[in-house]
Amino acid sequence: NYDKLNHFLFQAFLFKSRIMTRIERTFDTLKQHGKKALIPYIMAGDPNPEVTVDLMHKLVVHGADMIEIGLPFSDPMADGKTIALAGERALMGSTSTKKAIEMVAKFRQTNQKTPVLLMGYLNPMEIIGADEFVQLCSQAGVDGLLLVDLPPNETSAHFNQILKNYAMNQIFLLAPTTEEERQKTVLEQGSGFIYYVSLKGVTGSKALDTADVSKHVEQIKTKTDLPICVGFGIRDGASAKAIAGSADGVIVGSELVRHFEKVGDDADKITQAIEQILSKMDELRQAIDELSS
């Protein structure tokens, strides 16, 4: 009986280690079809809590392969002005970390397929407690976490183990300025995909050298089998297509989020902003898909 139990536990372990996360499955499917991922970023609760879940569903209809949700935080050091303001609006509307996670749970009621990644900072997670935070995320159907201020080290390795127990991915940022040793640790610890920051600076920075980005992406690809997605500075179909030539996916945030800047509580303006966001999604999707047609 003892042997049987051991055999069962070993089989269960093998089964668990074989399970692909939703993020991994999505990239696998895209690769089989010769397609690249379009990953929009929106801030949870921006411009108000009522908008987020409905917008997530609309983003999927308009070509999102995965959705990145920002967790509002009062001191967002890596975020440019556009995303920082979105966070302020969300906090003004009382969107807490737990409420943001609840939005994902609501989205999951009718969408079991599209991966959702949360991007945020350590502090709000530490207030809840790492284990409880990951448990809440897992129950809600979150697939990956990107904590901007959690560097790849012993702490992140421990956190990585917690995430693996819940079949979730830990996403890390790599930048043009990342030192070799740190890059090595990121490629060892990261899973799901690598988020390559295309610019030296903060989100929404302006000058994007697509040829330089492609060169860096190709270099990273010689060191890892993980998909590489590029974010920061992608504003239109042309830049998305140029980036998707070498990368496995493009992440677009500021270019979408900026449409909520001046809407306030005006329902008509919010509707108009959403239409502009979805129109931009169509442009990006079409441009990226031209690569595989």
Predicted regions and their residues:
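Active-site beta->alpha loop and helix N-cap motifs at the rims of alpha/beta catalytic domains
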Residues: 71, 84-150
